């Protein structure tokens, strides 16, 4: 019964459409009608600015972190916290409060890893920043980080210093999270192949793609 309760709470937390609500209530802007149409962190930064984007990133990460801490807070250590966190990501991606049309799972997945293995998140975040600097594409950085995440958990225990609290669900959950992230970025991947993906004004842009005006 408690397991079902934790899953429900995690899903509902994840379902809070942070960027969408911030846009509607503070800026009177519907993110779905601007930019990529996505309600996640990247489009929030692009359309609403740094303050709204930062708030969206922080809250979306917090949803994942809080969800993974639920079993610990209530003393149910027999329940896999990483598995509970997965349902927050599921809620973020398919939110009941926003017609099941949500973000691309990156920020909330990061929040889940922050609560489970902060050093491991730092490792993947370093990969994210490196790829972002080299190619100036948030989408590419997200996809590459997801792939590296899968490869790294498959090499455990070689990276035990990054995952001291390894959970037997971790490999399975990370693969699921990576799958969701990659699938949610399928349109971005297509644009990357055709050199039409959105760029940020930072980094080397090694693909030499011409930024959109």
UniProtKB/Swiss-Prot annotation:
InterPro entries: G3P_acylTferase_PlsY. Its EC number is 2.3.1.275. Its main location: membrane. It is found in: Cell membrane. Pathway: Lipid metabolism; phospholipid metabolism. One of its GO terms (biological process) is phospholipid biosynthetic process. It is a multi-pass membrane protein. The chain crosses the membrane at residues 3-23, 68-88, 112-132, 134-154, 163-183. Signal peptide: none annotated. It holds the Pfam family G3P_acyltransf. One of its GO terms (cellular component) is plasma membrane. Keywords: Cell membrane, Lipid biosynthesis, Lipid metabolism, Membrane, Phospholipid biosynthesis, Phospholipid metabolism, Transferase, Transmembrane, Transmembrane helix. It catalyses: an acyl phosphate + sn-glycerol 3-phosphate = a 1-acyl-sn-glycero-3-phosphate + phosphate. GO terms for molecular function: acyl-phosphate glycerol-3-phosphate acyltransferase activity. Catalyzes the transfer of an acyl group from acyl-phosphate (acyl-PO(4)) to glycerol-3-phosphate (G3P) to form lysophosphatidic acid (LPA). This enzyme utilizes acyl-phosphate as fatty acyl donor, but not acyl-CoA or acyl-ACP. Probably interacts with PlsX. Belongs to the PlsY family. This is Glycerol-3-phosphate acyltransferase. It comes from Streptococcus pyogenes serotype M1. The gene is plsY.
């Amino acid at each position: 019964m408690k397991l079902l309760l934790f899953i429900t709470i995690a899903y509902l937390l994840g379902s809070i459409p942070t960027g969408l609500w911030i846009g509607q209530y503070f800026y009177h802007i519907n993110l779905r009608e601007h930019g990529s149409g996505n309600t996640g962190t990247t489009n929030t930064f692009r359309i609403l600015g740094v303050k709204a984007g930062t708030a969206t990133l922080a809250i979306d990460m917090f949803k994942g972190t809080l969800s993974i801490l639920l079993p610990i807070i209530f003393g149910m250590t027999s329940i896999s916290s990483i598995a509970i966190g997965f349902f927050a990501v599921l809620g973020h991606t398919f939110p009941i409060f926003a017609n099941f049309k949500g973000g691309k799972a990156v920020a909330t997945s990061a929040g889940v890893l922050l609560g489970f293995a902060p050093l491991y998140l730092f490792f993947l975040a370093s990969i994210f920043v490196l790829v972002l600097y080299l190619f100036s594409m948030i989408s590419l950085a997200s996809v590459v980080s997801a792939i590296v995440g899968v490869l790294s958990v498959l090499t455990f225990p070689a990276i035990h210093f990054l995952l001291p609290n390894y959970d037997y669900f971790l490999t399975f959950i990370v693969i699921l999270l990576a799958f969701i992230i990659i699938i949610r970025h399928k349109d971005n991947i297509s644009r990357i192949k055709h050199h039409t993906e959105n760029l940020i004004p930072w980094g080397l842009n090694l693909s030499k793609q011409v930024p959109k005006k």
